[in-house]
Design a protein with these regions (language model features):
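Long, contiguous domain-sized segments
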Residues: 1-83, 276-278, 282, 291-316, ...
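Extended, highly charged clamp/arch subdomains and adjacent linkers
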Residues: 68-355, 603-610
């Protein structure tokens, strides 16, 4: 097994280009060896501008863009397509078109229609700037390329998603192309990967945990579907009262979804037939709906009206809403989630595509997978827990996930205190109300966060935790002295761990001297950091991206930390599929990205953000 830097090549297709350009870095270690690190990122570019996107009806709000007309190539995110044009005067007295004409660059704007809307962009430095859409080029991702040209996206698959054997072969070609460097006394690089031991690491493998579900049954990771046979570790402690919301004219689809959920959860039925592998009483659900409400598609006002109507009904535990496919910014998803979160009502969205699977008897086999995930989503959003870890290594009482959400220039929100006990059982999450300046979490908010952590643990166990592990996603370091004083005054041992997902390093594995992809659980580590594979690549293209796990302080052994991270990555509540991140930082990140959908200022065990 070896540390490894990425490598690739490129393809061109008319207006879209896919580049995989290697960059190199030389690092000289204490052993006087020079190590070549090759880092390659897939880069996509296009001749299309934001103006072309608007003309084709492609949504642009939220896209990352670069100013192609500027000397410094400013970059940022599209905030708004304005309701005024490039020919209308702005605050500084002239229009954007006049601005370029006065600069002597009329050739850039002379063919742009006066009706072209202005684009408002928040730059990466926080500035709020208005642009002509023709000046802006989107920063393309693989996902966007797929939407622009699905065929091209498939054709570049082999170049973008490569297994480790292919990656190393391409790197060897690249090293041979470098050859001997005459200016450095004919220095050349070896083509074999160096052993991790030369870099100060040891190699190992973390075995998957055993999970405990209903009836104290133990199941293996990869067989989570058995939870429907044995029941959940903890189901909601009441009979759920549900409200239903659906677009006008889709009552048949809504009925199909509702009947499937109700009969599956209460009777163990699937498509009106008793399933011998599904137990009765998975979740207790009230037979009659609290409210059934229609809404008109394409009318934001009607979305809010329907959501507010449900909001006024007392006692609803969860809303099941049928919504259009996709995440259109003008669709009902955001208004529904935001309004219901304000009054502490979780919701489970079901797409029309999924609903049609339940309506179509021929799709019954396909619909079962979706039903599993819908039921798990309802479970997690109403306080239930499908499974926990049987045995967690390390003498730890609870785990806490921290993250920071950026909402506007210079303003950050700590979305923290996702707290789990030593078995990975959710005790609750806490989203503070206060916004803060800068990425350094204010002392007052830290106090609030960890007070809530301690209160949640005490409420469950009747005593203060003795040992806490804090996971965070690499944001700026907080006041180390504060942690020392806070936990020291309470006699609590603490360990802080950074879990980083965006790294360029890879792992490779040798089987009979052949290079293959690393497997789930493969890792390398030293005293204070490790690289860990948390992704199962079976039947998938490409190679897994490991996590970088760094211990910042504390006494928990690095081998135990890696095992804890892997175990926590196997405990996602809302699906039988696994997440790459542990649920500590993974769920904290989800709160950040869905901040407006989550109640604030209170500890809660309902996973609104799933």
């Amino acid at each position: 097994m070896a540390l490894y830097g990425k490598r690739a090549r490129g393809v061109i297709k008319k207006s879209i280009k896919a580049w995989c350009v290697p960059s190199i870095r030389i690092e000289i270690k204490e052993n006087n060896y020079a190590y070549l690190k090759i880092d390659t990122s897939s880069i996509f570019s296009s001749n299309m501008t934001i103006a072309d996107y608007i003309e084709k009806g492609i949504p642009v709000v939220g896209l990352d863009v670069v100013n192609d007309w500027g000397m410094n190539k400013q970059s940022g995110k599209v905030l708004e397509v304005c309701d005024f044009s490039v020919a209308e005067p702005l605050d500084f007295g002239t229009s954007l078109k006049e601005y370029y004409i006065n600069k002597g660059e009329a050739y850039l704007v002379e063919n742009i229609p006066d009706s072209t809307p202005v684009i408002r962009v928040q730059l990466n430095n926080g500035a709020d700037i208005k642009y002509i859409p023709n000046a802006l080029k989107p920063v393309l991702t693989r996902e966007i390329v797929g939407k622009m040209d699905a065929g091209f996206s498939l054709r570049i698959e082999e170049y973008v998603k490569r297994d480790m054997k292919t990656r190393v072969e391409l790197d060897i070609d690249f090293i041979k192309d470098i050859g001997e460097i005459k200016e450095l006394d004919n220095l050349s690089f070896e083509i074999e990967c160096c052993p991790v031991e030369d870099l100060g690491y040891r190699k190992g493998n973390v075995l998957l945990p055993k999970l405990v579900c209903g009836k104290n049954k133990v199941i293996e990771c990869g067989k989570e579907y058995q939870v429907f046979n044995y029941g959940f570790y903890k189901k909601p402690n009441k009979k759920l009262k549900i409200g239903y919301l659906y677009p006008t004219g889709t009552e048949a689809q809504m009925k199909a979804i509702v009947n499937a959920i109700y009969t599956f959860c209460t009777k163990g039925y699937f498509h009106e037939i008793k399933d011998k592998f599904v137990c009765e009483g998975l979740i207790d659900i009230q037979g009659s709906a609290m409210i059934k409400e229609e809404y008109d598609l394409g009318d934001i006002t009607d979305y809010k009206r329907a959501a507010n109507k449900i909001k006024k009904i007392e006692g609803i535990d969860i809303v099941i809403a049928l919504v259009p496919d996709g995440m259109d910014e003008d669709g009902p998803y955001n208004p529904f989630k935001t309004i219901w979160a304000e009054c502490n009502i979780p919701s489970q969205m079901v797409s029309m595509r999924t609903a049609n699977l339940f309506l179509n008897e021929k799709s019954r086999n396909d619909s079962k997978y979706y039903l599993f995930n819908i039921v798990l989503g309802i479970l997690g959003k109403t306080g239930g827990i499908p499974w926990i870890v049987k045995d967690m290594p390390g003498n730890v009482d609870c785990f806490v996930g921290l993250d920071v959400a950026t909402m506007e220039a210079g303003i950050h929100y700590p979305a923290c205190s996702v707290i789990f006990d030593k078995f990975g059982r959710l005790l609750g999450f806490y989203k503070p109300k206060q916004a803060q300046k800068g990425e350094k979490i204010a002392i007052r908010i830290l106090q609030d966060i960890f007070d809530q952590v301690i209160f949640s643990y005490e409420e469950e166990y009747g005593e203060t935790p003795k040992s806490i592990v804090i996971h965070r996603d690499g944001f700026s370091n907080e006041n180390d002295e504060w942690y020392k004083n806070y936990f020291g005054s309470k006699g609590i041992a603490y360990t802080i761990v950074e879990v980083r997902k965006n790294i360029s390093s890879k792992l490779i594995r040798y089987v009979d001297d052949e290079i293959v992809n690393p497997e789930l659980g493969n890792c390398v580590w030293n005293q204070n950091e490790g690289y860990l594979v948390t992704t199962n690549m079976k039947n998938k293209k490409g190679s897994p991206n490991p996590l970088l796990v760094e211990k910042k302080c504390g006494d928990v052994k690095m081998s135990d930390i890696l095992t804890q991270v892997l175990y926590l990555s196997q405990l996602h509540v809302g699906s039988i599929q696994k997440t790459r991140l542990p649920i500590t930082t993974g769920y904290a990140d989800k709160i950040c990205k869905n901040r407006e959908f989550v109640p604030e200022g209170k500890m809660d065990n309902k996973l609104f953000f799933l």
